[in-house]
């Protein structure tokens, strides 16, 4: 499944939050699916954990971008601030690159100036919910509340509308959750490159991170990076140089 170009020309999330039609969501499976990919060292598009016969695209959910071009879509999950965000933003600005930052409500509340900086510097800021729950374990009303309250907090504290992209917490989804998200006007963005980077107390080496990209990069890659990762922060300039080579 190919993501449309990740531009900020999407419906602002504050408008997207209104459901457009009444849907019987009970028709959609609520079985929990943990997102994962089988990365390929031959640089071909990885396979993802999608139920047989299901098209993610039908739900406006994507895990790769344009697979015909040598492009990569940088995405960062922002659960809380670890002291590396400004340096990451500085690197992106220096390289004239844009990313998507998926923010939780607590991240916005604790770092409104950082979120404003992301928007001012041309990045997309997407939704990562209020309390970071597995959405397959939430009823429809709870999913809506998790998403809408996060978007409202961003508008209130930064003055900016949230861009209508979402990353499901922990990468756990269900077809029902994807349908609710789609009906709210959001695109679900998963990932095609990932590794263990989210524990600040157990960080990989910079060489390990760079080697992951060197080994598994593919056209249209959407890597999952974490804002609390010292390794990601320090590896980012090397990753960018690698992609330009």
Q: Model-found features: residue ranges?
A:
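Structured helix-beta-strand junction loops
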Residues: 95, 121, 184, 219-220
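Active-site-proximal beta-strand/loop segments in catalytic clefts of secreted hydrolases
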Residues: 76-79, 102-106, 129-130, 167-171, ...
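Catalytic grooves of carbohydrate-active enzymes
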Residues: 217-245
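Alpha-helical scaffold elements lining the catalytic groove of polysaccharide deacetylases
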Residues: 84-87, 133-158, 172-219, 232-235
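N-terminal secretory targeting signals
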Residues: 1-58
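Active-site beta->alpha N-cap acidic-glycine motif
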Residues: 36-138, 142, 146-156, 160-163, ...
């Amino acid at each position: 499944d190919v993501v449309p170009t990740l531009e900020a020309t999407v419906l602002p999330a504050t408008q997207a939050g209104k459901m457009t039609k009444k849907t019987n969501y009970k028709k959609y499976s609520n079985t929990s699916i943990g997102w994962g990919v089988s990365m390929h060292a031959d640089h071909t598009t990885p396979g993802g954990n999608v139920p047989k016969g299901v098209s993610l695209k039908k739900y406006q959910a994507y895990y790769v971008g344009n697979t015909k071009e040598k492009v990569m879509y940088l995405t960062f999950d922002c659960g809380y601030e670890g002291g590396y965000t400004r340096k990451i933003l500085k690197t992106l600005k220096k390289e004239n690159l844009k990313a998507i930052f998926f923010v939780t409500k607590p991240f916005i509340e604790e770092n409104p100036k950082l979120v404003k900086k992301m928007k001012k510097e041309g990045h997309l800021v997407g939704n990562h919910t209020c309390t970071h729950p597995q959405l397959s374990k939430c009823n429809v009303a709870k999913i809506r509340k998790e998403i809408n309250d996060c978007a409202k907090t961003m508008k209130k504290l930064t003055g900016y509308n949230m861009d209508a992209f979402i990353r499901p917490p922990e990468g756990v989804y269900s077809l029902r959750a994807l349908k609710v998200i789609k009906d709210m006007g959001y695109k679900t963005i998963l990932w095609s490159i990932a590794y263990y980077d989210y524990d600040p107390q157990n960080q990989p080496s910079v060489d390990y991170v760079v080697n992951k990209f060197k080994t598994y990069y593919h056209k249209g890659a959407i890597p999952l990076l974490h804002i609390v990762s010292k390794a990601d922060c320090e590896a980012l300039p090397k990753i960018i140089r690698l992609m330009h080579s």
